[in-house]
Amino acid sequence: MFKQKKFMAYLATVFLLIVSMLIAACAGSSETKKVTAQNNKPIDITDLTGRTVTLKKPAERFVLQWSGAGGPFFTISALMGKDTPKVIAGMDTSLQDYRADMWKHFTAEMPELAKIPVVGTVGDKTFNAEQVVALNPDVIFIPVDLKDQYESDAKPKMDAAGIQTIYIDYHAEKLESHQKSIEAIGKALGKEERAAEISKFYTDRVTRVLDRVSKINKPKPTVYLEVGMNGPEEFGNSFSSNYSWGH
């Protein structure tokens, strides 16, 4: 009798274990289907010109222009971390040319950055559209300031190859422009939550500074700043009052 009860208890335990496994499997299957459905859902992105760009899925590889502007590259590296070199299909050399100290630190952590194909720059007409098409990225991020020349010289070729263009803007030096650029890049790469965290971090700190400065009731001194990328041998390299930090 005791052996029979023990055997029945054993069967009950096995039965419960099987049921638990089936429930877990069904739940896992349901969750997988949910994630798959989300990944297959078209992604609508509003870029900095107000255009709506639709991606079938998050971009896996992209081309970057004006990397030396700092903003887009820093946003991408904050979004992707050590995977940054894997997602950049090609870029210009302005980051390493104009911000050599930053480039040195980034390549020390991610040596693969130095192996990313150089595709030239739209701004100085070295942009190699044929090379970009051959690299087959999903997206190309273009600064708003390059829009006219890009649309004249290269965009038709990108459109024909099915490469989506997303305009961003880190040069207006406006909080809203930075926020929208971070959001657009994050959405394009399927990193919306992380992009929201980055945007909040940035917004909190900029707002904190602006709030403090707005409360200073003293004469504001005149300040002259230069762009240091040409070294101490050159002077007069600065921005006008209607561009970047010259605002």
What is each residue range found by the language model?
Residues 21-25:
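C-terminal motif of bacterial Sec signal peptides marking the signal peptidase cleavage site
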Residues 1-2, 27:
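Short, aromatic- and cysteine-enriched interfacial helices/patches
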Residues 2-13:
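Bacterial N-terminal signal peptides that target proteins for export
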Residues 13-20:
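Core hydrophobic alpha-helical transmembrane segments of single-pass membrane proteins
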Residues 26-247:
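N-terminal ligand-binding lobe of clamshell/alpha-beta domains
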